[in-house]
Amino acid sequence: MMNRFTIAFVALVGSIAMLSCCGKDEKSDSPDPDSLAVQTDRKPFHTSDPLTGRTPSTTVSSDKMALYFFGWGEDKDYIFHLDFPEKRHDRVIIAYTMTSVLEGPASYDNTTMLFVRNKADGQWYEIARAFTPFGNAFTSSWSKTFWIDVTEYAGMLTGDTEFRLYYGGFDATAARSHAVKLDFKLYEGKSSEEVVWTAKVYDSSRDGNSGYRAWSYGVEGYDIEDDTRLGRRTFTLPADVKSVLMKVSISGHGHDQGKFTERYDYETNNAAEFDENTYTVIINDVAQKNTGRIFYSNRNNYQQAGTYFYDRANWAPGNPLNVQYWTITPPQDTRQLSIDLNLEKFESQFTDPKTEGCAQYIVEVDLFGYR
């Protein structure tokens, strides 16, 4: 039989245990400072319709647009407009069709970037990036469609909407040219999440120093980690933003045989197109546990001419970009969010960032705040 002292002692221990458990639960709601950013397993694109069986309420389509070199600056990009319904949609999927004009696609694997103007802030956001195939062996009947989920841009896709198209190749001829056709599939419904805030973190297409909308990598005096490039950026989050999606679009280009200074006994493999890299995400001056990898296996790429089966830095000939998505938990004690991305250290073999073959990265990083 328990006496009063024993009963009191048991009650005290139970109370302490309950308080301890409560403390743990409370603490678990707030991630550690080095775990605020976590990469998700969201697919960058699909090779078949991810919403098969569900009918879009509206499809907004572009004409088939031939791809040729429009010019060096953003003001030379191909401009077009599409008219969307005025209401917001639950899901938005682009059916991105690679095709051709005249006798078939052009020869090479070049960068294509699609930008949309956000009416709210007037800025251009890269909604999709893709790479043309080695098209020599394809005829005029060839085409290939990919499906890209762009639901986070739904708020920008209302009414008369302006787009810019960039193509980084010079391979169009009088007989052959790559082309692209876009079908925006809009699905009605009430989303459980709503984007209430957007911001740009990095955009190399605005001030690329390589000549190709990219930032050179490892060239002395043109550090990609400079404040004007991949430097620290600070944002004030609106009070109603509960979570943040970070979209990281990085593709490597060039065939530079420089040196990764922190890799022991390593032989560079034509950076930055054919050599992999990693990046560290720094949130509010704290390096995150998860690191990003700039690499894409082309082992299962479909057959083309050329080096379509060689692994590359986040991309494959004839495919959309290997975009990476991160969720960021805003710090609990402040509405200030700073972001910094650090690549591995590299010393280029070149001294001029515009030298053909110089290692370079095309970079766009955007934030989407959810209520």
Named regions from a protein language model:
Residues 11-14:
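Core hydrophobic alpha-helical transmembrane segments of single-pass membrane proteins
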Residues 1-9:
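Bacterial N-terminal signal peptides that target proteins for export
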Residues 26-371:
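Extracellular/secretory-pathway and virion-surface proteins
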Residues 17-21:
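C-terminal motif of bacterial Sec signal peptides marking the signal peptidase cleavage site
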Residues 3, 23-26:
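Short, intrinsically disordered low-complexity segments
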